[in-house]
Amino acid sequence: MAWRDPFLFETADGELRAVWSAKVSPTRPAIAQARLKRAGDRIELLELGPPMELPDAELMTQAEVPKIYFDPKTGDYLMLVSACDRQHEGQPDSEVTQIHRLYRSRSPSGPWKAYGGSVSRLPGLDGLFGASLVQHDLSAGRLIVIGPYTENAGPERHLRFSEPREILIGTRADSERAGAA
């Protein structure tokens, strides 16, 4: 099974880590993780960690382009993933649901929980896949997100990046819009 989409980040205490897309079975996604160290102009592997399973993994077949950010105001880590329900590579894009999911944890290794209790789906990002957080403030319930448009966004947007989008999270209205999925 493919490992792809590596993302490097520093923890709150300055440790270098990596996460990437992985799977624990053909239809169950996970996020792989590793602790790294800088060695001159190289990066070396310190430890390959266990796969991080997502609390709602049964809602998707792939968790791609994982990115982890630290929120210094709350002390929480945020993990943003692009999720889809693709069953096989030959499946037409029109049959595949692509969404962004957000999780939070006190540790960069998890355990992870949906940002909204039972809700991980981020609203307001239709047509995007592989987005990044430009800014985040969990205490204010505010994210600024940018990402590439997919083919489903239409020919005028495909292969372009969105303008930054403000996403308000943590409110009851937001949770109701996002739905339990």
Where are these regions (language model features)?
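Carbohydrate-active catalytic/glycan-binding domains of CAZyme proteins
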Residues: 1-181
